[in-house]
């Protein structure tokens, strides 16, 4: 489907009047995604609330040790929260975290609990920040679109003074009705650990700002860990914490543990267990976001220097590197099977990078401003032969999927999510992106883009042809048959040697295995060889010399031979030199994707994108949360009215204005003042 191929026929290139209209539904091959009629009032009040003047606030103390105090009184509950950007310092981006606690609330459509004790009941819990405030709500149940997030009835509310919450994350591994662990990062550098059930459980890390004085840009619990988490800062540092250990009373001392191209890893010098346990210095400038692979073994980081770096977390080795086309990278996510990484950033593009091949496989152009959020949709990402091969769960055969293409691909329509791929076949990855241009885009990454058959089949003679099997299938997998979960030892046997360099990898930088030399040069040879296979002789001659840039001390002539053979603490990637190599291919050297859907869905920049089984959740900077029902999951007007009444949950997907929160002081107890 062409860009913007939804109802109304408008797209990115339509008239200004059409582009200004906020969409309430969009269509894909599986049907219509709808924002139901119950959201009309909230939608009409959205722009008005964004223009409501914010009452003058009392002066706040500057962030620092003096403002990091214990529990205290909250600010006035009657003043509306800030809506949208305004004069003065920019507000932190609105973030949303969701945790699932097993079975949904037994109350069904009954009134949700209005006290903090209600956090212990089943269902989902949602946390999001707005300005200096942090809100907690009962979220969507497992039938995601059949319950809305009622922003007028918060379970808990916390107001912070002197600093602002910038990010947060629930511990899904330990989440239960008796404990909900949450991490909150702040603009002054502190990190708070709290339990929403056990009110006496609360800790503040980096309280005196001795570890790092810059804002916390992102934090995440380690997969399947009860106590370990990572926190990244605007300084470009990534810290490993243990909630069971205290912080040192003096600035921590570190010893160099490992070093490579563009990164360094330090261990804390301390006889007693103290936080932080380790520090990573990654890239140049702020470390904007990071994400663990589905198997929890690899860590993908994106920085303001425009680099995507993928590390093997346990061995702290650099496994992959990619450079943005322009500017910094702001967001990152993994595909459900761990084969691909998608990034978005200041080049207005979404970039798909293959972890198994170490190269950019596609770029997507549909946004007109920075891309703030990217996410794969595991419920429409599918392998069409998986159902036939597995023969489980009563899924339809491949012939039935071909007969009913519009019904395939949704979580409720018999699609086969990739987690991981049981068998190689016709693969379609679905992912989405949300940008500062208020546009929401959906993208399909299909097999013809991932494995282009005709050009490669004519000249490629080495094993591991991408046109026949996925790249991981031809890699040495230590005896593991077929493409399954990414193993700890991922071989690069499908990498092609450079015709001039003989495939030698000199220079430190990227390592495939401990003790095995691996350099960025192999990334460059991949793209150069594929350009030759496509018959692009002109491009090959034009950029042939650039293939030696990243080969370090491999003996090649040109600027590559001038790089030092030893590791460097920070990245020295020159954008002018890497452009045209595998680290950063030119626009015409990789497929350019068109969005399946590209719609304006908000008045302010979008900051949140979550894919759930029955719905999609988006949020924008003015504090509006939208729930989009998947095809076949939306109620009619009569059903919505029948299930929405006085004192009951509105059971249709809705978008609510945070301005209504302040009218519920009884439901908004204050928390820790930082």
Swiss-Prot record:
Sequence positions bearing N-acetylalanine: 2
InterPro entries registered for this protein in UniProt: WD40/YVTN_repeat-like_dom_sf, WD40_repeat_dom_sf, WD40_rpt, WD_repeat_creC_regulators
Pro residues bias (residue ranges): 53-65, 78-90
CC annotations in GO: cytoplasm; dendrite; nucleus; perikaryon
Biological role: Regulator of the deubiquitinating USP12/DMWD/WDR48 complex. Functions as a cofactor that promotes USP12 enzymatic activity.
Self-association and partners: Component of the USP12/DMWD/WDR48 deubiquitinating complex. Interacts with USP12; promotes its enzymatic activity. Interacts with USP46.
Protein name listed in UniProt: Dystrophia myotonica WD repeat-containing protein
Native organism: Homo sapiens
